[in-house]
Amino acid sequence: MMNPRFFCPEGLVPDCEIALPLAVAHHAERVLRLAVGDPVVLFDGCGGEFAATLTALGKQPLARLGPRLPIEQESPLAITLVQALASGDKMDWVVQKAVELGAVAVQPVAAERSVLKLSGDRASKRVAHWQQIAVAACEQSGRNRVPVVGEILSLARYLALPAEGTRLILTPGAAGALARKAAPQGPLAVLIGPEGGWSAAELELAERAGCEPLALGPRVLRTETAGLAALTALQTLWGDFSGDSHV
C-alpha cells in the first residue's frame, strides 16, 4: 500500500526535520488518522520526493525527511489542456482528471458560449480552488510536479500568446484526425470548447492563429468528456500510455 503523500510548497531539504504546513498536518492527523512515527511521502513540486516520518503533530507538527528520491511520473508528452469555462462542478472534474492523465498545465478560457461567467475576485478564487484540486490530484496519482492552472483568459488573449509547439482545436465535423498526424516534436496544446461549442468566429480566429482543427470520432462529446478523451488519445499515441518515450 502506498504511503500517504503530501505537497509542501516550501522547498524541502534532505535529511533534516521540517515544520509541516498546518493544512497538511490537519489532513494527516484529523482526516487520515495518522500518528507520530507513521511514514509519509512529501514533495515540493521541484522534482522528486522524500520518504519522511511524522515526528510531532498538534500545534507544532514536524516530519523527519530522508534523501530526495529521483522519482518522476511525468509523461514524455507535454500537453496543456485549454478548457473553455464549463458550468457547475465540471471544471473541478476536468482539472482533477487532466492532472491524473498527465497534463502539464490547464488553461481556462472564457468562450462566447461559456455558461459560467467569472471575473475579478470570483475568478481569482475559482482559479485558486482549481489549483488546490490539481495539488490533490498529484498527491493521489503519484506526480511530483504540480501542473499550473492559469488565470482565466479570453480566447483571443490566449491565442495572442506565443505558441509553444502545436495547437489543436477540437470541433465536431473537422476533417483532421489524430491518428493521421505525425508524432509531435514538442509541446502540445488542446483547445476544448464550452457546452455550446466554439462559435464560427472563434474557430476562424483559432485557425488564423495557427490552430489545427480536429475531430474526435463521429460523436459529439460533452465539454467535460472531450478534453479527457483527447488527453487519453494523445497519451496512447505518443505519450506514456504507449509504452514508448520517443517524444
Give the location of each predicted region.
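N-terminal positively charged helical leader segments and presequences
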Residues: 1-70, 121
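Generic structural signal for residues in well-ordered beta-strands
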Residues: 40, 63, 146-150, 213
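Residue-level signal for inorganic ion chemistry
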Residues: 37, 98, 134, 206, ...
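RNA substrate-binding interface of SAM-dependent RNA methyltransferases
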Residues: 72-168
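Active-site/ligand-binding-proximal alpha/beta "capping" segment
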Residues: 162-203, 212-215
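Short, ordered loop/turn segments at secondary-structure junctions
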Residues: 11, 68, 110-114, 218-219
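Glycine/charged-rich beta-loop-alpha catalytic/anionic-binding loops adjacent to active sites
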Residues: 18-20, 76-80, 186-189, 208-216
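Structured adenosyl-cofactor binding patch, chiefly the S-adenosyl-L-methionine
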Residues: 200-247
